[in-house]
């Protein structure tokens, strides 16, 4: 059915049954938590693509900015990892993986970078 009703008057509205099937949790995450989960999941996917040789570091950054609208102020999905710092990024992803599952699993190449204090972009 989807999340919206499309009545004949043309004004879509949220489907009334949505709240019944997906009630709000009593405790909601903070804005910072939601932001981190969104940024980290996108950066992890870009890092996986780099690790698998699908895309270069520069192309991953440009693609994330122009392709899906990663916040330009953060420099791109890969640059964001450099900005946060690989060690901190990996530690926070490990915590997210514990709480939310495998989608936050860190690729081995990024874990190795974190252990040797490397960056994707040379300064």
List the model feature ranges, each with a label.
Residues 1-123:
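N-terminal glycine-rich phosphate-binding loop for ADP-containing cofactors
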């Amino acid at each position: 059915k989807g999340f919206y009703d499309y009545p004949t008057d043309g004004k879509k509205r949220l489907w009334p049954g949505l709240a019944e099937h997906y009630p709000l949790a009593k405790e909601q995450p903070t804005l910072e938590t939601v932001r981190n989960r969104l940024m980290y999941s996108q950066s992890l996917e870009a890092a996986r693509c780099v690790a698998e040789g699908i895309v270069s570091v520069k192309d991953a950054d440009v693609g994330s900015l122009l392709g899906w609208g990663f916040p330009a102020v953060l420099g791109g999905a890969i640059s964001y990892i450099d900005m946060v710092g690989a060690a901190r990024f990996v530690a926070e992803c490990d915590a997210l993986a514990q709480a939310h599952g495998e989608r936050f699993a860190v690729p081995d190449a990024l874990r190795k970078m974190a252990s040797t204090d490397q960056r994707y972009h040379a300064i």
